[in-house]
Amino acid sequence: DHGENSLAAKLREIARRTGIRIVGPNCLGVMSLRTKLNASFAAAAAPAGDLAIISQSGAVAAGLIDWARAHHLGLSGLVSVGDMSDVNFADLLDHFALDASTRAIVLYIESITEAKRFLSAARAAARVKPVIVVKSGRHYEAAKAAATHTGALAGRDAVYEAAFRRAGLLRVNGLDEVFAAAETLGRVRPFNGKRLAILTNGGGLGVLAVDGLLDLGGETAKLAPETIEKLNAKLPSNWSKSNPIDIVGDADPQRFTDSLTETLADKGVDAVLAMHCPTALSTGAGAAEAVAKAVAAHRSKTLNAKPVFAVWFGGTPQLDAIFATARLPPFATAADALRGFMQMVRWRESRDALMRTPPDLPPDFKPDPARARRAIRQAISEGRQWLDQLEIVEVLDAYGVECASSVLATTPQEAAAAGRAYLITNGAVAVKIASRDITHKSDIGAVKLDLRTPEAVEEAARDILTRIPKLRPNAHIEGVTVHPMIVRPHGRELIAGIGDDPVFGPVVIFGRGGKAVERIADAALALPPLDLDLAHSLIARTRVRRVLDAYRDVPAADMDQIALTLVKLSQ
C-alpha cells in the first residue's frame, strides 16, 4: 500500500520529523564493503572492490553479489532500494559519484518516481565515472508487473531509453549484459578509441570475433607496417599477417607474450582481445600467465595503458585466479568480451557528448512563448484537451515552425471563395474537417484532395459538412479548412511532434510519417530541449534517415532544416 494513510507514508513522516534516512522498505539491505558493514540478509558478502551496485530488486542484488563472489570481482557498496520511501536513486548516485573508492556504478531500475532529480544526479555521475543501467519492463506485460512490484507508474520504455541516453547512462538489456559490463568496469579503466586488435591461436575464432565486433559498431585495428615486421620476426611464417592476429594453433606462452607486446605498442591499436583455444600443444594456464606478464610490462611503461580482454575456452578456477591477480577481465565467450569492450566505448562517447559545448542556434530564431501561451490558455479556459488546427498553427508559428497556410470556412460558399484565391497560384487545394474532436480525419472520409476548381471545393465542403455530423454527432465541428496542395514528387513523409510521458514529461518525437505511422513504428524519442547536434542524433536513430540522403534521381533532403525544425519544436 502506497497511499496517503499507508504504513509507508507514516514511515516517511517519521523520517522527516526525526532526520533519519530510510532505505527501503521491501529491500535486501545495504553493504559497505570497505568499512565491513553488512546490513542485509544476503547469503554472503561480496569482496571489497570499486564497483557500486544500486538495485530496486532485492533478488537481483542478491544475484549480483553471488556472481561477484564467484568471479573475484570486488564491490565498494551495494544498496537495495526497494520501494524508495525515502532514499532514492538520485541520493545514491550523488553519493557514489563522489565516493573515491567507487570507479563505476551499476543500476537495476524498475521504475523512477522523481525524474528531474534522477536525471540531474545521473548526468553528474556519468560525467565522472561509467554508469550502467538495466531497466526491466521493456514490454507492456513486464512493465505492468514492475509497476505492481514497486507501486510506481512505469512509463513508456522508449522514453526511459531517451532519458538514459540524454543523461549519459549506458543501457544494457539483461543480467547477462550487466555481468559483462561489471566484469569490464571492475577491471578496465576508461580508454580512448574503438579500434580493437584480436589476438588468437585459432583462426576461426578470430574471424567470428571480427563479425561480432562489426555487428556491434566497433572497428578493427589496422596493424602498422612496422608492427607486422616485428611480428614476422617472432612468429611462424604462416601467421595471418593482419588483424585478426592468428599466431597459429601450436603457439607456446612465449609466442603469446611476444605478439601481445608488439600489438600493444602499435599506435593504431586502442585495445586487444586475446583468445586461447586449448590444444595438446598449448596449455591454457601457460598462455594466460604469458598474457598477464605482457600486460604487466605494458602497464609499467605508460600511464594510459591499453585494455586487454581475455577469452580462454575451457576456463578453470586456476585461470580465473590468474586473470583476477592481473586485473584482466575474463569472459566465457568472445560475444561477452565484445559487448564489454563496446560498452566502454559507448560510455566514453556518451561522456564526451555530455562535456561538449552545444552549437549556437541561428541568430534569427526568436520564439514568442507569450503568444503560444495565449492560444493554449484559451483552450484550457474552455475545458478543452485539444487545440484546433488554427490554434496549432498559431503555436507553431510562435516558435518559427513554418506551416502550410489554411483558411477556416464555415459554409461551402466560404470554402469555394478560399479555394478560388489559392487556385490562382496553386494547381489544386485540399479540404478537411475542422474539429478539435476528430483527430484522424481521413479515417471517416473527412479529407478531400486534389480539388482543381472552386466548384469542386464547394461540393467537397458541402459533402463533409453534411455527412460528418451524422457520423460523429457528439463532435464539435467548426467548419472546414481549405489548404493549398503541396506536391513534392520526391518528398519524404516525416513525423515530428511532442508527446507527454507520465514520468519524464515532454518528449520530442521524430520518424517516418504518413497514415501508416503506427504500423511502421519507425520513430525515435529525445528529451527536450534539443540543440542542433542532439537533433541530428535523434534523426540518425531512425530507419527513415537512410532515405533522406540522395539516391538515384531523388535529391537529398535538407537535413539542417529538419534538425532546426526539431530544435524549434523542442523549445
PLM regions: where:
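Catalytic-core regions of core metabolic enzymes
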Residues: D1-Q571
